[in-house]
UniProtKB/Swiss-Prot annotation:
Keyword Repeat annotated: no
InterPro entries (UniProt xref): Ribosomal_bL28 (IPR026569), Ribosomal_bL28/bL31-like_sf (IPR034704), Ribosomal_bL28_bact-type (IPR001383), Ribosomal_bL28_sf (IPR037147)
Transmembrane segments: none
Pfam families, per database record: Ribosomal_L28 (PF00830)
GO cellular component, one term: cytosolic large ribosomal subunit
Gene that this sequence comes from: rpmB
GO BP terms in the entry: translation
Highest taxon, organism lineage: Bacteria
Protein family according to the UniProt entry: Belongs to the bacterial ribosomal protein bL28 family.
Protein name: Large ribosomal subunit protein bL28
Region Disordered, annotated ranges: 1-25
Sample GO molecular function, one term: structural constituent of ribosome
Amino acid sequence: MSRVCQVTGKRPAVGNNRSHARNATKRRFLPNLQTHRFWVESEKRFVKLRLTAKGMRIIDKKGIDVVLADMRARGENV
């Protein structure tokens, strides 16, 4: 399973660890992914999504129906 948010599309980013001596070693910044079930009243079913905490806030703000419509318009399988 890839580490990509289904709502925002956020992926792992690449950067550096920096020691006290400012030595750089490569590292990955991973998105804060959670698996969450949402009840979709219009479809009378649960939808299971893998999304970031930011994606959950977007669903709280816009509503699950609007977000699912956007995802389906992008071609996401839901």
